[in-house]
Amino acid sequence: MRLTVVGANGKMGRELITAIQRREDVELCAVLVRKGSPFVDKDASILTGSDFLNIRITDDPENAFSNTEGILDFSQPQASILYANYAAQKSLVHIIGTTGFSKTEEEKIADFAKDTTIVKSGNMSLGVNLLASLVKKAAKALEVDDFDIEIYEMHHSGKVDAPSGTALLLGQAAAEGRNVMLKNVSVNARNGYTGEREKGTIGFACSRGGTVVGDHSITFAGPNERIVLSHVAQDRSIFANGALKAALWAKNHENGLYSMLDVLGLKDEF
């Protein structure tokens, strides 16, 4: 499968290029960076320190998408909307690992998915998606009046959105387990005099620092006991490999908006 990596000079872009080179069932077709990037017209190998790849880095989407079958996208929300439009027009598979979308942007992506196959997830790893399944089951089983839910995440100092897409994915799982809307029960910050914790809310706490790839934990705090579920990402390759798995899966599926739960066969479990 021929693939284009967008946002290629970012951490995940570089990881995706490396992951593609290690496999025989996918091929790096093009590499796209932002307009005016100093990497334009250089060989893609400069991004990974690998041997010469004979793929010229471009900042022109038309050029990058002219001979590809799929787009691997861990960029920024505004850019992802642009790429989703291209994907819909050209019937290209679009794998979206970008996070931080607004409600309006989410609606646009859903609309574009009518004309192409999109897999969108706040986290592409098997472990996190299994964790989400467990979180939903736990939230459903534990009484709201007895157990409070708190989600904690930590990422590297360069991450620009909070809570992370993964934290929100886990929060959504917990909310679905309790049959409520996350937006109605989430508490994203506590500061100063907050009063007592409101029953049924789902709290989020975020930290940024160092080179942390991604730590997430979900605590169900009840009377005299706590249940803690967690996931630690040690290397970004787990996200890259998940994205490639999603692309190959999407190639053989009808137009629509899917998640990694679909790709991993966890939808029914979830």
UniProtKB/Swiss-Prot annotation:
Where is it localised?
Answer: Cytoplasm
User: Is Transport given among the entry's keywords?
Assistant: no
Residues that coordinate or bind NAD(+) = G7, A8, N9, G10, K11, M12, G97, T98, T99, S121, G122, N123, M124
Active-site feature positions: H155, K159
- List the Pfam families hit by this protein, alphabetically: DapB_C, DapB_N
Name the positions where (S)-2,3,4,5-tetrahydrodipicolinate binds.
H156, G165, T166
Q: What's a single GO MF annotation on this record?
A: 4-hydroxy-tetrahydrodipicolinate reductase
**Record keywords, A-Z:** Amino-acid biosynthesis, Cytoplasm, Diaminopimelate biosynthesis, Lysine biosynthesis, NAD, NADP, Oxidoreductase
Question: Is NADP included in the keywords of this UniProt record?
Answer: yes
Q: Name one GO biological process term.
A: lysine biosynthetic process via diaminopimelate
Coarse class of the primary localization is cytoplasm
Q: Which domain of life is it from?
A: Bacteria
Specify the enzyme's EC class, one word.
oxidoreductase
EC number(s) for this protein?
1.17.1.8
Entries under InterPro entries matching the protein: DapB_C, DapB_N, DapB_N_CS, DHDPR_bac, NAD(P)-bd_dom_sf
| Residues reported to bind NADP(+) | R34
- Report the family membership: Belongs to the DapB family.
Spell out the NCBIfam families in the cross-references: dapB (TIGR00036)
Query: What biological function has been recorded for the protein in this entry?
Result: Catalyzes the conversion of 4-hydroxy-tetrahydrodipicolinate (HTPA) to tetrahydrodipicolinate.
- HAMAP family recorded: DapB (MF_00102)
* The protein, known as: 4-hydroxy-tetrahydrodipicolinate reductase
Naturally occurring in which organism (per UniProt): Bartonella quintana (strain Toulouse) (Rochalimaea quintana)
